């Protein structure tokens, strides 16, 4: 949590991807792509997912990309990672999900930080359309999305809340 407070929390007026305005921004890419933060994120998210049986972790690009990869590495090869594109490619194999095939597999959708739940729920929809069984959503920081994700019938767990970071 200290790396998040030190590297990721930026104070100042910002517009979030949800369109909402806020007095601070949590830029977790500063942690997930950091030489010390990335490996730690993988271990922490695997702990968050304890008790869930799953084969792969991934989510909507870009925030989820390093999170899924960190979990893959921290698992010692026990799980795969996947990336959900915002839109299907118009060339090549025209895939929406990159990485190992998720069809018939139990997956966890991950996200670095979520305010409204829109990104993880978009990834859930894409994973299900590709034939995956989504068993839950795991967030590094729940900025308020947990209730929306649970209302969609999914279990949602987070490593940290705004209160944990002293932001609530």
Predicted regions and their residues:
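Short, well-ordered alpha-helices that flank and scaffold nucleotide-derived cofactor binding pockets
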Residues: 47, 69, 73, 125, ...
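Conserved acidic residues
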Residues: 55, 105, 135
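Short glycine-rich phosphate-binding loop at a beta-alpha junction
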Residues: 52-63, 138-139
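PRPP-dependent phosphoribosyltransferase catalytic core
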Residues: 2-6, 125-168
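Active-site-facing substrate-recognition patch
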Residues: 1-52
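Short loop/turn motifs at secondary-structure junctions
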Residues: 53, 77-78, 131-133
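Short, glycine/charge-rich flexible loops or terminal/linker lids adjacent to PRPP-binding catalytic cores
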Residues: 65-108, 115-121
